[in-house]
UniProtKB/Swiss-Prot annotation:
GO CC terms, sorted: membrane
Catalytic activity: a UDP-3-O-[(3R)-3-hydroxyacyl]-alpha-D-glucosamine + a (3R)-hydroxyacyl-[ACP] = a UDP-2-N,3-O-bis[(3R)-3-hydroxyacyl]-alpha-D-glucosamine + holo-[ACP] + H(+)
The protein's name in its UniProt record: UDP-3-O-acylglucosamine N-acyltransferase
Organism: Marinomonas sp. (strain MWYL1)
CDD domains: LbH_LpxD
UniProt record similarity statement: Belongs to the transferase hexapeptide repeat family. LpxD subfamily.
InterPro entries named among the record's database cross-references: Hexapep, Hexapep_transf_CS, LpxD, Trimer_LpxA-like_sf, UDP_GlcNAc_AcTrfase_non-rep
Self-association state and partner proteins as the record states: Homotrimer.
Origin: domain of life: Bacteria
GO molecular function: N-acyltransferase activity
EC identifiers of the protein: 2.3.1.191
Keywords, in A-Z order: Acyltransferase, Lipid A biosynthesis, Lipid biosynthesis, Lipid metabolism, Repeat, Transferase
Pathway involvement of the protein, from the record: Bacterial outer membrane biogenesis; LPS lipid A biosynthesis
Higher taxonomy: Bacteria, Pseudomonadati, Pseudomonadota, Gammaproteobacteria, Oceanospirillales
A GO BP entry: lipid A biosynthetic process
Amino acid sequence: MSYTLGQLAAKVQGVVKGDADLVIDKLGSLENATSKELSFLANSKYQSLLGTTSAGAVLVKTDELAQLVDNAIVVSNPYLAFAQISHLFVPTTHSWSGIHQSAVVSPKATIAENVVVGPNAVIDDDVLIAEDCVIGAGSVLSRGVKIGKGSRIYSNVTLYHDVEVGEACIIHSGTVIGADGFGFAPNDGFWEKIDQLGSVIIGNNVEIGANSTIDRGAIENTQIGNGVKIDNQVQIAHNVVIGDNTAIAGCVGIAGSVKIGASCTISGGAGIAGHLSIVDHTHITGMTMITKSIDEAGSYSSGMGMEPTGKWRRTAARIRRIDEMAKQISSLGQQIKKLSDKG
């Protein structure tokens, strides 16, 4: 896959500074790109690398920055332009076409044109796969699953019965969608299983990382909105609703019946307790524990950041004494007030 600099500039509505006929074969970082590769500068703290990079061309924001390299594409948002151009250089991820002979496909399944089904995949009864989809090797689409146009299911993904995936979605390997939610009723010292009768409904243009899990609803469906991006090893429990264009980083755990608004970001390792609501445009920093609903947009954090071990131990020791210290401060305040009253 090769493109001229002029072709790439047209793709992102950019302006070429330099040789528009320069052929670009790959994308690369400013540190390691070669003369046939395109890089980008999105953060000014890396501007010094423009003087040392071997990249054939660089995506930059201003004409002034373009003057620091031999060839450039000037765009308003270099990082976004880099993302858009990256789609042109995606390699083919499978070496077969059509339905592989080792795949197990039910005669009751409906598979549209231009669908690829990999080796040892299983397509159960009443599955509906729209056109231009790719189902990777070893993936299992259980009874009644629906996959929208242009979606890609990588190898060894499991979709339980009646799960629905929208158009242009990407689901990475090892992900399990539609397993039973964690529902049990206490019964005289034992646990009675609550069968999970809902499903999981995933919107359009959703990406789900490797080894993530999304549980089916107990009665109502678990719902993932359009444009949602979910990183690796994320757990989403039953009946959760996630609004459009929310992004969730790795190792986040979301307990049952949580409702998360649109355009939120949840950073890595955060935990959200069950039955809470979070409004649109809320941003949760890494390792934060959410224990109550958030009804005002903004950035929220909890916990303590890293310190040298000795300092952290002293801080922890003081935290253990916080009740005692509060009483001492209150007592001192009362003594000061008495002295002031005597005046």
